Amino acid sequence: NLSFETSDFKDFKFKKIYLVSNKNENRSIKLSEKVIKFKSHLIKDQEQRIKNQSIECEIIDISEVKNIGENIVSLYPTVGENLDYLNLNNIKLNFLYRKLDQFSWQYCNKGFFNFKNYIPKIITMFT
């Protein structure tokens, strides 16, 4: 359920899909070059799969999101530097929430070690 073509939103008709990359210069905690390269390959792979479905798609840096214009819809980034960047730069997006995330959030209140006890229940719910 993590790739676009099998997500909750696969039947939505989007005009264009932007895949957002967050390079080290935008991060407060720098990632290793191996991690940056791995993430870049994941994004390029997703771009190709979307284009294979004849959907217009472009990879952009997170700093370019503010230049897209209004009426932007995005998967909710939950936590981390992407959400922090959007908030710090006052970038307003209309978020889409995956059913998997919405269901799982109820178990996200006492850290990972408590959450992991619910993983089998979450998997059962979505398989």
Predicted regions and their residues:
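Trp/Phe/Arg-rich N-terminal binding region typifying the photolyase-homology
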Residues: 1-127
